[in-house]
């Protein structure tokens, strides 16, 4: 609460303890909030990084409150935290793609594959994300474009702003280990 005092507002919602995390609702809310920022010309990278962090911290706080009150089982906490991470990954990937200068197509042909706690839907508070990145795109520029996307995505997920951080990212599980490419084509 000291680091993110804004989450205290979550306690004013009388339904907070009885609700569960809803990925669709969370992602629609992020889209609405981004549109509101865009309408006033405030949707630069820093604003979006902070928007993601505020939404993430608020949802983790709601999950923690439900956990402390005994409303959720350990498995439900892990499910909700894992679903939150998936939503953050999906949204951040899309936003990074839209902002990528050298993209060669409208929609990416790219996936984030989760291993470890996230892959097993066993994420806990403060867990890192063990993820690898793959693409299926025959364009000759694809390798470079998706490598740029991955660098941007990792930065957006890990950089600490005034609103804090999102996740630590561990990419060591990629096919060739720490020395391998950050992103691999399906054909490789």
Question: What do these predicted regions represent?
Answer:
Residues 2-188:
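Non-catalytic regulatory/linker segments of enzymes
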């Amino acid at each position: 609460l000291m680091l993110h005092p804004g989450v205290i507002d979550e306690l004013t919602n009388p339904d907070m303890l009885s609700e569960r995390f809803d990925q669709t609702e969370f992602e629609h809310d992020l889209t609405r909030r981004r549109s509101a920022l865009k309408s006033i010309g405030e949707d630069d990278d820093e604003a979006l990084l902070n928007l993601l962090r505020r939404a993430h911290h608020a949802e983790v706080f709601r999950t923690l409150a439900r956990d402390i009150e005994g409303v959720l089982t350990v498995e439900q906490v892990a499910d909700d935290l894992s679903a939150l991470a998936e939503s953050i990954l999906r949204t951040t990937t899309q936003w990074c793609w839209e902002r990528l200068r050298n993209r060669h197509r409208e929609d990416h042909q790219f996936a984030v594959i989760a291993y470890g706690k996230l892959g097993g839907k066993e994420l806990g508070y403060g867990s890192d994300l063990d993820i690898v990145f793959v693409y299926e795109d025959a364009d000759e520029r694809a390798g470079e474009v998706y490598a740029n996307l991955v660098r941007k995505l990792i930065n957006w997920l890990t950089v600490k702003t005034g609103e804090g951080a999102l996740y630590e990212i561990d990419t060591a599980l990629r096919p060739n280990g720490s020395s391998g490419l950050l992103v691999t084509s399906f054909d490789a």
